[in-house]
Amino acid sequence: MNFSTIEESVLKEKKKFNNFLSGFLKNSRFLIILLTAAAITAVSISVWIKSPEYQVLYNHLSNEDRGSIINELNEMKIPYQFTDSDGPILVPKDKVYEIRLRLAENNLPRGGSIGFELLDKEKFGISQYNEQINYHRALEGELARTIKKINSVKNARIHIAFSKSSLFLQDKKKSSASIILELQPGRNLNTGQINAIMHLISSSISDLPVENITIVDQSGKLLNQTSVEYDQVNDSQFKYTEEIETRYRNRIKNILEPLVGIGNIYAQVTAQIDFNAQEKTQEKYSPNSDHKNQSIRSHQIIIHNEIEKSNIQEETPIPLSNSNNHVYFNNNIKNSKNLKNNYIPVDSKINRDNTVNYELNHSVSHTKMNIGEIKRLSAAVIVNFSKDKNGKFVPLSTQKIKNIEHLIREAIGYSKARGDSVHLVNASFAKYDQKIPVHINHINTFRKSNFLYNFAPWFCSFALLFLLLKKYICPFSKNNTFQNTIPVQEKKSIDTRNIIEKNTFQVDLQNNTNTDKLIHKICNISNQNPRTIALIIRQWMSDKI
């Protein structure tokens, strides 16, 4: 191989580069441009290094808060940056917390709403009407701030119509509230969050029922559905009904599968649930008919006595005494034929009123019906034919069907008064010849206990990783090992020219005078045999030294 030709070509390329560089430096125009660009770059780098690092002070501010904060920053002579009307406000990084504390002294940011700090600025001599208006504004602002703490809510406004006090209950009206929410981009509120907002507002304001709250988003969509249809059809009621039906269906399967076998029974249960909230107050009065246990509430006796004297023509009798409503006279009176036992009877009237008031049995009961009470159950069950001694499928006997139906009734708590119904059908399944695995639990036990089943994914992963390492990492390690062994070969004084001649490639440099082709071939040789090129360069360096 002719190495002198290679050296000459390399020297020619160096000369060409030197000539180009010298020509470029001689041209003053290019030199001025180069120096100007270098100066501009140096100044830009110095300014960039000396400029303070900015950090976000506040983000997602309303226009009112943004203007107030910018005015405060101008008064404090603090540099700031912001991109657009909705972008963050940037301040120097080392002053972020100091600026936040100084702005907090002025109640900034307010979140686009005024809270109870409005009451701190009331003037002396303000009227009661204005004071009430300020309180309503402050309450609306505080509730708006509270709602904005929810992650999906960007901004909120609340309008409350407070009820006026009245002496008459029939003239008193309930309060109402309207809420408009501006949601974060790509965010939505679920039903639970909407209900939470409604109950939060309802519990913060007196005489404000949940039904009088309306929530609307920024696109004008009504978020809370208060219609009767929505109350009857919601996710929680569907889930509760499905849970009840699944529970009764599992009861039927669990009690019948030991008798007919797994897979030989299909059951469906339909439940009618009463989701109406009802309260009932009942008062009962019954007479106290038990004479032994009668309790007297009051007893009143009134006696009225009237006495009329008889007409006596002769001497006036001298009354001796008056006892037991009888008048006794002297025995010397004439015409004593009508006298008996020494007294003269007179006319008398006695009126006696006896009033007894007894206690009545009085009972008051207040009953609150549970929501979700079962109104009616209906069960439909299909049982497969059973095998006889010959292996043929035959229908079940009448007695066995009755027993199965009785078990179904007991399993679901059948109530005739409630109107429950059970329908049992004994029929041959369409795929009765398909073998149904009876011992399914054995398969799960095998999966848990089998070593290969548990560690097969890990084994495959490690095997794949090993193949990748062997294919891509090992060749690099072999090249490094060869490079480490080159000094040993030099110590053994191996002639590099002989090593080059042993290689299988040959380059015809004499026939290729074109420099581009020569460089192209040298590049190909270096890509195919980097070891040979390394040895050539080392040989050149050793020769020059």
From Swiss-Prot:
One BP annotation, GO: bacterial-type flagellum-dependent cell motility
Similarity section: Belongs to the FliF family.
Highest taxon, organism lineage: Bacteria
GO molecular function per UniProt: cytoskeletal motor activity
NCBIfam families reported in the protein's UniProt record: fliF
Location within or outside the cell: Cell membrane; Bacterial flagellum basal body
Keywords in alphabetical order: Bacterial flagellum, Cell membrane, Membrane, Transmembrane, Transmembrane helix
Transmembrane feature ranges: 30-50, 449-469
Topology term for the membrane: Multi-pass membrane protein
UniProt GO cellular component terms: bacterial-type flagellum basal body, MS ring; plasma membrane
Assembly, per entry: The basal body constitutes a major portion of the flagellar organelle and consists of four rings (L,P,S, and M) mounted on a central rod. The M ring is integral to the inner membrane of the cell and may be connected to the flagellar rod via the S ring. The S (supramembrane ring) lies just distal to the M ring. The L and P rings lie in the outer membrane and the periplasmic space, respectively.
Function: The M ring may be actively involved in energy transduction.
Record protein name field: Flagellar M-ring protein
Organism: Buchnera aphidicola subsp. Acyrthosiphon pisum (strain APS) (Acyrthosiphon pisum symbiotic bacterium)
Alphabetical list of InterPro entries matching this protein: AMP-bd_C_sf, Flag_M-ring_C, FlgMring_FliF, FliF_N_dom, YscJ/FliF
Keyword Flavoprotein: no
Gene: fliF
